[in-house]
Design a protein with these regions (language model features):
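C-terminal active-site subregion of NodB/CE4 polysaccharide deacetylases
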Residues: 1-70, 76-77, 107, 111-115, ...
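Metal-dependent polysaccharide deacetylase catalytic core of the NodB/CE4 family, i.e.
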Residues: 7, 12-13, 64, 88-263, ...
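Anion (oxyanion) recognition and catalysis
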Residues: 39, 86-88, 207, 274-275
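Conserved beta-strand->loop/alpha-helix structural units within folded catalytic cores of enzymes
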Residues: 72-74, 78, 88, 92
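Short alpha-helix within the catalytic core of nucleotide-sugar-dependent glycosyltransferases
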Residues: 79-83
Length: 322
């Protein structure tokens, strides 16, 4: 095996009767089609094999490129995905943000996704403005307007996401979204956390199926752009490993950068290398992981809701140059 590709999945949605049909994700039936097609074209590898590959302890003569399944954000959907993968004998890596376990709170992107999916843009923006006013943040500096008849829906959602990710400070972004969560979604859905995220019991069952878990920070900030203090950096990058290992009695050797683009992880590679807490760290930059690639800047292919099995195979073969 001269290299391997890694997949990054998020939502795996029901094939029918989805209670939140506007959540974009891979449908369960399409996910099965992905698995069946990928098993024919690639050698599916485990996290242990990925670690061995990066550190020179694996036979690299295999003709088929390797393929690793990974999942970000600790979503409730991943419990379904883990059981499906087990049916096919596949061991995946599930990257868990620890705030959902220790604080009982969702991560920022998931608040945005579910709130927009259920309430629509304008109701979300009303709650957003209320949150800004509540925390005495100047509304005019961060205001967003949406005109349904003239504005592009997807472009407006992208604008909203960028405000939370890059324009508001991370502390303000976090408290504004938690205000929206508590005063909108959680008020209407008392079981909100179970709808959005994995429970401790489900994570234990995922491990029992033979899968691995990894760290996805504590509360999902963009590490490189959030201007974290050294104390906050430790809480986000290293505390989760300690907590997950202590809670679930398992080794946590892999880390996944939240958002995963270069502006989100720049500079973090050197820190991870210096402290030796993790053996691998994954981005969402699309490339084949070869022996020359840094184990702390590994590539992944983010799977989108529009990716059919045929498109996925075509894109991955192009990346692997096979």
């Amino acid at each position: 095996m001269n290299g391997y590709l890694a997949l990054c999945y998020h939502y795996i949605r029901p094939a029918a009767n989805d209670p939140f049909p506007r959540i974009l994700g891979t449908r369960e039936d399409i996910f099965r089609e992905h698995i069946q097609a990928l098993q024919k074209k690639f050698r599916i590898i485990s996290l242990a094999e990925a670690i061995n590959f990066s550190y020179g302890n694996m036979n690299r003569d295999e003709e088929k490129p390797g393929l690793l399944f990974t999942f970000d954000d600790g979503l409730s959907d991943h419990y379904r995905a883990a059981r499906i993968l087990a049916e096919y004998g596949i061991k995946a890596v599930f990257f868990i943000p620890t705030c959902l376990l220790t604080d009982g709170l969702p991560i920022n992107p998931i608040v945005i996704h579910y709130s927009l999916a259920h309430y629509g843009i304008n109701e979300f923006l009303r709650a957003y403005r209320s949150a800004l006013e509540n925390y005495k943040i100047n509304v005019n500096d961060f205001n967003v307007n949406y005109r349904p008849k003239t504005d592009n829906y997807q472009e407006k959602i992208y604008e909203i996401k960028r405000i939370f990710k890059y324009k508001l400070s991370y502390a303000d972004s976090r408290r504004v979204l938690l205000f929206i969560y508590k005063n909108l979604f959680a008020k209407d859905f008392p079981e909100a956390m179970e709808i959005m995220h994995l429970t401790s019991k489900q994570i234990k069952e995922i491990l029992d199926l033979g899968h691995n878990i990894g760290s996805h920070t504590h509360s999902h900030p963009s590490i490189a752009s959030a201007s974290l203090s050294s104390e906050d950096l430790r809480k986000e990058m290293f505390y989760p490993k300690e907590y997950l290992e202590r809670t679930f009695y398992t080794k946590v050797d892999a880390f996944s950068y939240p958002f995963g683009e270069k502006q989100d992880y720049a500079g973090s590679e050197q820190l991870l290398r210096a402290v030796s807490a993790y053996k691998l760290a994954f981005t969402v930059d699309r490339f084949l992981n070869t022996p020359e690639v840094s184990p702390f800047r590994l590539g992944r292919y983010s799977v989108y809701s529009t990716d059919t099995a045929e498109k996925l195979i075509s894109d991955l073969k192009a990346l692997a140059q096979v």
